Amino acid sequence: MKSTAGRGVCGASQWSAARETARRASKLDEEGLEVVVCRHGMLLRALNMYRGEIFAYPLYLQKELQAATNGQFYCTDIACKYWPYIEKLAVSMLDLRPLLQMRPFLSVMHAKAHSTKCEIIWSGKNQEGAGTTAGEEVEMVNSYLSRCALTTKYMTKSARNDMLTVHAIGWNRQKKKCLHLALSSRYIKTFKKAEAESQRLEDLSSELGCPENIVHQWVHDVRQWATDGTRCDDDQSNLQKSIEQMFLGVHQKKASLYNQTDSNKIRHLRRRRLWEEKRKLFDTIKLYNEQVPDEERIVEEKVVSGLSVAGGDREAESVIWPWEVHSSESSNILTKKKIFDAYMSKVRHEEEKIIVMREMRQHCTYLKRMADNIRTVISEISSGRNSGCLNEEGHRGLLCLLQKRLADVEEKFQVVCSSYRQALGPNASSLLEDGPEEMLEDHEEVDYESSDDSDFEGV
């Protein structure tokens, strides 16, 4: 399969992970670790990287998990580049076509560094059925495993693998132990936030003069604007790309000025370089403004506001350039995007309530089935049907272990159900019902797939 030339650039930022090939490091055998986690932070798979971050690693992990689970979403920080790569491979490799059934999901925080249109199309907060999954859970695992780096770099390969495995097992054990607390807390927070987001959408609609029957039309208009990729002529297009790249470069360097430096000497050098790039950016903006009509010019004050890191204005998070706006919508696309963001936030929180309730039910059902299976094994051993070659003493010891395990599972089941009932309140009556309809309550308009579906993230 011939690799696609070019860099992994999206809206001006260059992503080192968005590439198909990479050179081996001359002084390193293993360059890092790539992991996959579920939306609850449990580590599912991991592999050693030998050639930096390339598409082949998440492809392998996704293929392994797709065969073992029924994942609905896969999340990466370069989903907009990774999805075309899978589509290209699926044309010639039939065994990879099932991967196209999973939906791409751009992690919410990483989406802020992508272009505005890319964020609207790919970000998890705009994906139907994703709930409020952030897609950044893998960063917690990376932070935890990074503690091993001080010691594992002096170990042999086998000892290093054992050390990382022990830490991964400990991480998953702790996550599994506290799962009922995490789900209960998540449901309570989501329930409160859903009411707040619904009220925020109503207030914003009243403020902007957008009645309820127009909200869906504005949401559709924003999606259509994001999928429209028309550009100007070649000369202006080159200037536009340069402005986007320089703007995001200055913004990111300014944001990381104190995070990635620990001495005034280095900060002084970076400030000087930052000032030069900022001057070059505004020179390019002036050159662009000389070539376009007055209504299509870039307002330098908005660019300065967008470069402000300390500002809390949401409009500063993403600048919408004049060439990104349809000529007929130049006055109201920003207004429509405010409604779009508020509407998506409301819908995602409503979805999250259903998802968490379904996960609570799955957790209780899992513990109940485990207890039933242990009782079945105890019954078979007690009746002598499954005693094997054990002597009488071993037979009694095995029964004691199984009874101890059964007592632990039953106690865990009671604790979990009590926690969920306290969090759900009146909705707890359907927690262990056979039919999933009771859990949907008044949210019949939300259509979900099988309860076996899961979301996982690979970075």
Short names for language-model regions:
Residues 1-459:
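Catalytic-core elements of nucleic-acid end-processing and repair enzymes
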